[in-house]
Amino acid sequence: MKTIFITGASSGIGRETTKYFANHGWRVIATMRNPQKAGELADLPNVVIMPLDLMNPEQIRETSQTALAEYDVDVLFNNAGYGMMGPFEKLPEDEIRKLFDTDVIGTMLVTQQFIPHFKARKGGAILTTTSLAGIIALPR
């Protein structure tokens, strides 16, 4: 059975991707900051819910290493993201830092955890989604 590790699985693309892969015979490791938001995902066959906050480097290491110790992961899907709305010039610094900590640094730290695994097994895929917010304005 193929296995995919998905970040940001509590809503949106991550949630729907979890459903898709689970319904097509894959094992899905669905990660999210708040596992209580898993809802019906926890009832799907072959779905494993794990906590993962991309602003927490220690949790990134722990969750990634737990998943890799228990499952032979084929695909890493970096999907989690932090969104901001409003005029750029009015965005507070702490919100900008949260965005970079999640979308850039957190994503890079997760990816670092999986590269040795994929090298050792001589295969694997890393997918990363981005937001249209980098292309279009999202006024408040």
Model-derived features: positions:
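Conserved NAD(P)H cofactor-binding loop of Rossmann-fold oxidoreductase domains
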Residues: N79-M84
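A short, exposed helix-loop element centered on a Lys and neighboring polar residues
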Residues: T111-Q112
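Residue(s) in the substrate-gating loop at a strand-loop-helix junction
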Residues: S131
